[in-house]
Regions:
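Acyl-donor (CoA/ACP) binding surface of acyl/acetyltransferases
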Residues: 1-36, 66-175
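A short helix-loop-beta-strand connector motif used in the catalytic cores of GNAT acetyltransferases and
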Residues: 56-68
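Conserved GNAT-fold acetyl-CoA-binding loop/helix
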Residues: 32-54
Length: 175
């Protein structure tokens, strides 16, 4: 599949590159970044490499997936935003989830909203997704605010069976 790149005011959303592994692994080794992901466990470099490989396979199979997100000004990787299948939450399947994760230095600058807006528009307009969900663990209200800013509404409150943590599921339906 041809490369996809989306440029926003401050960000570039693009496919993953080999040189992304080290900054991605560093982000996923930060306990504060990983606090609200699954059971809150940090990831090893090997797990991160596998995640990038899986993301690229997802792209090849579906024509969309997780974008690596870099700052346009510095061309440094600051996180990701895009699409995955939330198989960890069987009660909402089948679904496509929009997700994001950013390095701590990128928090509070509006990057998650900027990236998620661009990715969501790509999924709905360019790839014809009809419904997209997003999930956050109760306590991580910053992610909930991003969901609301990009036009999503609360759909369900439930428990993540893999972590036992309460989560809120938001969705948006393209009419």
């Amino acid at each position: 599949m041809r490369s996809v790149e989306i440029k926003t005011n401050k960000l570039c959303l693009r496919r993953w590159k080999a040189e992304d592994i080290d900054p991605f692994a560093n982000m996923c080794a930060d306990p504060e970044v990983m606090k609200w992901i699954g059971s809150g466990v940090v990831r090893t470099r090997e797990e991160c490499l596998l995640a990038i490989e899986n993301s690229e396979h997802f792209w090849e199979e579906n024509g969309f997936g997780l974008f690596a997100v870099e700052l346009r000004e510095t061309q440094s990787l600051i996180g990701f935003s895009g699409f995955a299948v939330p198989s960890f939450l069987p009660e909402i399947m089948p679904s496509i989830e929009i997700a994001w994760r950013f390095v701590r230095d990128a928090w509070g600058h509006g990057y998650a909203t900027e990236a998620a807006t661009a990715a969501l528009n790509f999924g709905l307009k360019e790839r014809g997704l009809e419904r997209v969900v997003s999930i956050y663990q109760v306590g991580n209200e910053a992610s909930g605010r991003v969901m609301e800013k990009i036009g999503m509404s609360l759909y369900l409150e439930t428990i993540d069976p893999s972590s036992g943590r309460p989560v809120k599921v938001y969705d948006i339906v393209e009419l």
